[in-house]
Swiss-Prot record:
Pfam families: EF_TS. The keyword Cytoplasm applies. It comes from the Bacteria. Associates with the EF-Tu.GDP complex and induces the exchange of GDP to GTP. It remains bound to the aminoacyl-tRNA.EF-Tu.GTP complex up to the GTP hydrolysis stage on the ribosome. Transmembrane segments: none annotated. This is Elongation factor Ts. Belongs to the EF-Ts family. It is found in: Cytoplasm. Residues 81-84 are annotated as: Involved in Mg(2+) ion dislocation from EF-Tu. Keywords: Cytoplasm, Elongation factor, Protein biosynthesis. One of its GO terms (molecular function) is translation elongation factor activity. GO terms for cellular component: cytoplasm. Its main location: cytoplasm.
Length: 354
């Protein structure tokens, strides 16, 4: 019997098995669709396909950094349960897959599936792992960042395998880049804990900032109502939420207000130049709350909470003898954006006993 493309398409859609596997199964079954499904299941491929409708929202985030800190890859591979995520075989699968993505320069899931790992097509290798481990597994996403001779990349994955970060930096020289690797890893650890969304306030959309500013003021004003009732100090209500709202005109206005304040306090003008920089720094701290929450450079460093990441980078640049600029930031948190399946255990038991 002739095996048509439509037959292969139908079998693939109903089982989730690979195109060539479906074609071979239909050939062995002489075109019998049900028998072809049985053949796939007997080979373990049908078993993998049968699990494909179950949501995989657990798993591992894996990070692979090359020995010279010039290339780093992060991946998220999902399983259905945390139990499987702790399985050594699954952990090895995640590690091997991430290393394969990096060494082969793979950019997309489609490229990954058609690549070859240990002499086997990756799609088939992965389905074999699904059949062996016994749960639906999904390579959900991955990304690789690279650096030239004057750049450095590093990464960090939290011990529970649920959060991973990559950061890439451009440096003034190759020597500075070589010295900065451990510092960049420390920044990755910070980002894993503090969850910045972007590198800088320059990466924030202005419309988003305006909406968030309205929400921020409302939040602080609401909290102030309770603080006032309790007789506690009130929150400062900021004029701005991000540096992207503070241009030259806004800074000039703030400086003038500081000068008027100093004049009212009777401070001699000859010492204003020593006082104003500190007050301007305080002005920025009070009016960049959104940057402190969402941007890497605007956050206070977990290892020294008196300084922002931007300030720490400036200090490290001076220490190492050349400029360091963060140019790439990737953070994966396991299952973000996925809806975790909640089983109705009673309904499941009832279904099984009929």
């Amino acid at each position: 019997m002739e095996i048509t493309a439509q037959m292969v398409k139908e079998l693939r859609e109903s089982t989730g098995a690979g195109m060539m596997d479906c074609k071979k199964a239909l050939g062995e079954a002489n075109g019998d669709m049900e028998k072809a499904v049985d053949i796939l299941r007997e080979k373990g491929l049908g078993q993998a396909a049968k699990k494909a409708d179950r949501l995989a929202s657990e798993g591992l985030v894996s990070v692979e950094v090359c020995s010279k800190c010039k290339k780093a890859t992060i991946s998220e591979i999902n399983s259905e349960t945390d139990f499987v995520a702790r399985n050594p075989q699954f952990q090895a699968l995640a590690k091997d897959t991430t290393a394969h993505i990096q060494s082969s320069g793979i950019k997309t899931v489609e490229e990954l599936n058609t690549s070859t790992l240990n002499g086997v097509k990756f799609e088939e290798y992965f389905k074999t792992q699904i059949a062996t481990i016994g749960e639906n597994l999904v390579v959900r996403r991955f990304e690789t960042i690279s650096a030239d001779d004057k750049g450095v990349v590093n990464g960090y994955v939290h011990s529970n395998g649920r959060v991973g970060v990559l950061i890439g930096a451009a440096c003034e020289s190759a020597e500075v880049a070589n010295k900065a690797a451990e510092f960049i890893r420390n920044l990755c650890m910070h980002a894993a804990a503090m969850k910045p969304s972007v590198i800088s306030y320059k990466d924030l959309d202005k419309d988003f900032v305006e909406k968030e500013f309205i929400a921020l003021r409302a939040e602080l004003e609401k909290e102030n109502e309770e603080l006032k009732r309790l007789g506690k100090p009130l929150h400062h209500i900021p004029e701005y939420a991000s540096r992207c709202q503070i241009g030259e005109a806004e800074l000039a206005k703030a400086t003038k207000a500081i000068e008027e304040e100093l004049k009212a306090e009777g401070k001699p003008e000859k010492i204003w130049d020593k006082i104003i920089p500190g007050k301007i720094e305080r002005f920025y701290a009070d009016n960049t709350v959104l940057d402190q929450r969402l941007t890497l450079l605007g956050q206070f460093y977990v290892m020294d909470d008196k300084k922002t990441i931007e300030q720490v980078i400036e200090e490290k640049s001076k220490e190492l003898g050349g400029k360091i600029e963060i140019v790439k930031y990737v953070r994966f948190e396991l299952g973000e954006g996925l809806e975790k399946k909640v089983d109705d255990f009673a309904a499941e038991v009832a279904a099984q006993i009929g």
